[in-house]
Amino acid sequence: MAMIRSLLFISIAGMTVAIAALLILLVFWAPASVPWAITVVWCRHAVWLGRVICGLDTQVEGLENLPDEPSVIMIKHTSTLETYWQVAVFPKATWVVKREVMWVPIVGWAMNLVLDPIFINRGSGRSAVKQVIAQGKKRLADGIWVTVFPEGTRMPPGETRRYGVSGAALAQQAGCKIVPVAHNAGDFWGRRSIVKRPGKIRFCIGPPVDASTQDPKATNLIVQDWIESKMREISVLYDDEQEPR
């Protein structure tokens, strides 16, 4: 039954995201608020669809922790759900993503138009960090939040690795705060998994971390400690002895 429900969800979500992406491309001439509104509507629809069809009930904790000013979001990446959940919940944000995404037909093009992402080559090391800082500062100055997946890729549920420093370095140079986010979406919708198992998914937004007054490496450790500690609390797949690789 879970497989049937999951395939139904994938089919409907796939059709509707294609429609939304085409609409976005058709209104490329409109003010930026129009394609963004289409994106938010689809993301909320997808969250609703997951709840109705697959029993993926989402619970948000810590909304009061969101700063009033644009900030850097550092969020755990274990599933697909968190990518559109955050669009439905957070203020307008762009993402730091691998450059291959821009070449995905229709959806990738629409994403490029709506989010104006910070595309990086993950293998370019320091050059990628410089890209994130330079482009991220421009987005923040324009009032747009910046989302960073600090592990650099989607991790198998229950695993972690050392966090990249680009998010903390950007926040320091932009003089803004970091909002850490942990969630257990991977427990129910794992990486590369077709089956979505019903359950309560907790998205936990932590207290903002002021990155402007300390070394990015120190800030990174504070953020990583909070996220990984919260993951051990909310995810049944986490090993208490798990250490970053």
Predicted regions: what they are:
Residues 60, 118-121, 211:
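Short acidic-hydrophobic, aromatic-tinged amphipathic segments that line or gate anion-handling sites
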Residues 60, 73, 95-96, 203-205:
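Generic preference for hydrophobic
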Residues 24-41, 51-53, 68-125:
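Catalytic core of membrane glycerolipid acyltransferases/transacylases, capturing the structured
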Residues 1-71:
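Membrane-anchoring hydrophobic helices of lipid-metabolizing enzymes
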Residues 3-4, 130-245:
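Non-catalytic C-terminal accessory region of glycerolipid acyltransferases
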Residues 48, 84, 168-169:
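Active-site phosphate/pyrophosphate- and oxyanion-stabilizing loops and adjacent acidic/basic residues
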Residues 52-60, 129-130, 184-187:
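Short gly/ser/thr-rich secondary-structure transition/capping motifs
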